[in-house]
Structure formats: structure tokens, C-alpha cells
Amino acid sequence: MVSTFSMNINNLDEYITKINKYKPEALISYVNPLYEIAKFINQNDVNVYSPQSLLTGAEPLYEFQRIEIEKAFNSKVYNTYGCHEFMLIAAECKKQSDLHTNSDHLVVETLDENNKSVVGDVGDVVITDLMNYGMPLIRYVNGDRATISQKSCSCGNPLPMIEKINGRKLDVIKTVSGQRIPGELFPHLFKEFSPMDCWQSSTSTVCRRAVC
């Protein structure tokens, strides 16, 4: 396992060296770091080990990225979709098209603004975990927006498919100057502050935010 958080244009060759050393059967990565490595390989004609398969996640895999990555590694790349609460939710099959949901242990739905189930149109992702007996999550809203496909896959797998991950809902803090700050600021702001066991943030007006 190698961290991509320290990756930059000056050390991409170090990641390639590690791939060539370990010769993994499968390479699992965030989409963008693997895409950046692939561009470096193709632009500099670098020799790199070719895994049997490449698995990407954490963000959408666009077709131009798929082409670049597969050219660099001479391997097929399959995108996945998941979140911390459920891990792998859906994944591409050999057809590399829509994402098959893991319906053997997850119920994946999308709801419209009236909390009605929708198929073939974008909605809020809600998930029920059928295997989590420690902390059951029932119709859990994970903040993502997606479109569940109306069609079946030609691969023969009967599991339902997600046609597209359309985006994500986030809490945003708006400042007096009009700047918009992601709500994720606060967890990162306080995570290293050991004297604080818990905290809560609330907004009364645009110019006033209380943390207690």
C-alpha cells in the first residue's frame, strides 16, 4: 500500500518503481492519481508492469481517463462506487458499462424530493444494509445523487445497475463576503484538538456561527 496524498509531479517515477517491484495482480487506486501516473507513463514512454486488472473508485471515471489509464498499463480498468458506511456498493463488470449494485446484501434506492423511489432519473441515494447486525442502517441517506438504470446488463448478471453517480450534497458555509466553505472544514479543524471530545456547529445568520 502506498499513499497518494504525497504524490506530485516530481515523484511519479517512485510510484511506478514500486508497481514494477511488487508486480500486483490487481491495482486499486483513486481515479485521479492513477490517471496522473498514466499520463506520465504515456508522455515519457515509461515501462510499467501490467496488472491483470485495475480498480478505481472515490470519484467518477471519465472515458478519457479510462483510455489514458488502459493505454499506460495495457490492462482493463473497472470503476467502483462505495462509501465508508457500506464499503463497496457497486462495481463495473467485464462490459465496463454501468455499475452492478451488491444487492445480495444491500438495498440501493434513489428517492426524489418527495421521498418516492425513482428509477431512470436522478435521486438521493438511500441504502439499507442487510448484513450489519451490530448497527443496522435502514434507508440511510449517504449524501450522494445517482441514477438507477432501467435496463439489464448484457453480461447476464441480474443485479440492478447504477447508470450514473450524478454528484453529492454537501453542507456549505456562506461567509459575509460571499465565500462558500465546505462543511467538512470543522471535522478537520478540530480532529487534532485533543481536549475537545465533541462539538456542535450552528448558524443563526450569515455572519454568525457558533461552535460549542
What is each PLM-predicted segment?
Residues 1-212:
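Active-site glycine/GP-rich loop and adjacent strand/helix microenvironment
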